[in-house]
């Protein structure tokens, strides 16, 4: 297998690869909004056609929600499953975008050329890196280097409600020697990374109800309970002055970081002042006895993501509201059980309610943390391949976010997961003006060709 010929083909094909990516990016496959259901179908159809054009047996597979795309190609050698997701986040607030989020374009910036648009980095640009590596390999050699399965999801950004039932129903077809997930990032702009630790996630939507209707604050203010005041007091008590979460038992299943891992993380270059300064901050707000990387990668969190109630429109209305609402998310680590944390949090909130107030709940998300099996030989081989491409030693890192599919592959298919991606910290995923560096896209494709060559041996 001549790798150099594949790399040359990739270099030559970059303009066409960018055109293909932009065609996919123009499809507004927002999975959380039912108005875009047809667009999610179109994105899945586009990917099926692209995979078939390379010689894969590919199909759009129905679910109760958005379809999965499953493709198979190659024979012999190890069996590798590649995962990505074709759905994207909503684009609100649209007014903050510099251009139409679904009219992607290449822009010149002080740091180089970038592709701007929703889904460029999360995750269409990323999944197209491995598809383009497959395309180049097939064009040069006439076949794939080993047995490949491609598994593309359409509900990752909306909680993956169809994922587990689909894995259970299709376990025999999808089970491979290892799952490879391209939905992570670089450690620094030119230092590749393999993510070995992921935080879990659960979300809660809380409504506190007091009076049975909105009241006039002149007629009832001071005498009637105000749910916004109750909610604000409870949320303010969620953390102590040192940043520790006050829900009873919250830290019971949180393991201390092994010293070897802590030492490796401390050896990584990480400029905390720049990390915070890039978003207009200067002082860490988490647990004050932890290093910044520990806060981000190995410690649990509780964050209020939204709070509302009463009158929030233009002008002024002296209302005493009937209800107050909040959305709270928890990032989980180690052995924390999402169901246990949810029950503890609800009990803690309800224990603080005054008379005449009730709490109602809506659950969002429910995934435990994940720790990857770095003793799998594929990790060392992939690390060497990334080092060869980027000219910098690839590093093992944690991630503050959640990629539940990694844990699902282990729990339901018995597969370890290898997480490699080429996103950069300033890609603005989930935010207006999302971008993906053209260099990340180009070298990401080359990286996958090198990984394929090493894993297929």
Describe these PLM feature segments:
Residues 86-88, 151-159, 182-187, 210-212, ...:
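Acidic, glycine-rich active-site loops and adjacent beta-strand->loop/helix elements
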Residues 114, 119-197, 456:
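Acidic/histidine-rich catalytic neighborhood of metal-dependent amide-processing enzymes
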Residues 233, 309, 314-344:
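C-terminal catalytic subdomain
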Residues 207, 231, 316, 320-324, ...:
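Zn-dependent metallopeptidase/amidohydrolase metal-coordination segment
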Residues 187, 196, 217-307, 336-358:
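Acidic-enriched catalytic cores of C-N bond-cleaving enzymes acting on peptides and small amides
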Residues 1-94, 323, 340:
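N-terminal helical capping/dimerization or prosegment-like subdomains
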Residues 330-333, 360-375, 399-400:
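A short beta-alpha structural unit
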Residues 77-149, 443:
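Active-site metal-coordination/substrate-binding segment of hydrolases
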């Amino acid at each position: 297998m001549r790798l150099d010929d594949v790399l040359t083909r990739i270099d030559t094909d970059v303009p066409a690869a960018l055109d293909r990516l932009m065609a996919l990016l123009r499809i507004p496959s927002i999975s959380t909004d039912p108005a875009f259901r047809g667009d999610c179908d179109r994105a899945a159809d586009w990917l099926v056609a692209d995979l078939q054009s390379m010689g894969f047996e590919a199909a759009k597979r129905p679910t109760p929600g958005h379809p999965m795309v499953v493709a198979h190609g190659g024979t012999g050698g190890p069996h590798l499953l590649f995962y990505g997701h074709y759905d994207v986040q909503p684009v609100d607030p649209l007014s903050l975008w510099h251009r139409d989020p679904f009219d992607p374009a290449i822009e010149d910036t002080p740091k180089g050329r970038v592709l701007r648009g929703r889904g460029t980095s999360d995750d269409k640009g990323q999944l197209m890196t491995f598809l383009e590596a497959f395309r180049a390999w097939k064009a040069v050699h006439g076949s794939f280097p080993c047995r490949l399965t491609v598994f593309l999801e359409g509900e990752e950004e909306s909680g993956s409600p169809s994922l587990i039932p689909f894995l259970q129903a299709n376990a025999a077809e999808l089970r491979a020697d290892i799952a490879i997930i391209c939905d992570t990032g670089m450690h620094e702009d030119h230092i590749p990374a393999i993510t070995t630790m992921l935080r879990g996630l659960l979300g809660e939507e809380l409504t506190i109800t007091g009076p049975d209707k909105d009241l006039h604050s002149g007629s009832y203010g001071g005498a009637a309970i105000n749910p916004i005041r109750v909610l604000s007091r409870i949320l303010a008590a969620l953390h102590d002055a040192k940043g520790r979460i006050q829900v009873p038992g919250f830290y019971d299943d949180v393991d201390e970081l092994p010293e070897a891992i802590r030492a490796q993380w401390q050896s990584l270059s990480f400029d905390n002042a720049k990390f915070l300064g890039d978003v207009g901050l200067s002082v860490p707000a988490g647990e004050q006895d932890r290093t910044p990387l520990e806060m981000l990668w190995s410690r649990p969190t509780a964050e209020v993501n939204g709070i509302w109630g009463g009158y929030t429109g233009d002008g002024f209305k002296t209302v005493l509201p009937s209800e107050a609402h909040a959305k709270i998310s928890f990032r989980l680590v180690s052995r924390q059980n999402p169901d246990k944390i949810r029950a503890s949090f609800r009990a803690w909130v309800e224990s603080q309610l005054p008379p005449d107030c009730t709490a109602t709940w809506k659950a969002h998300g429910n995934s435990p943390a994940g720790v990857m099996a770095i003793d799998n030989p594929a990790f060392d081989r992939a690390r060497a391949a990334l080092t060869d491409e980027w000219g910098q030693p690839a590093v093992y890192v944690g991630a503050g976010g959640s990629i539940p599919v990694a844990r699902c592959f282990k729990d339901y298919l018995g597969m370890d997961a290898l997480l490699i991606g080429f996103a950069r910290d300033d890609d603005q995923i989930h935010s207006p003006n999302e971008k993906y560096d053209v260099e990340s896209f180009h070298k990401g494709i080359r990286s996958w060709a090198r990984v394929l060559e090493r894993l297929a041996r």
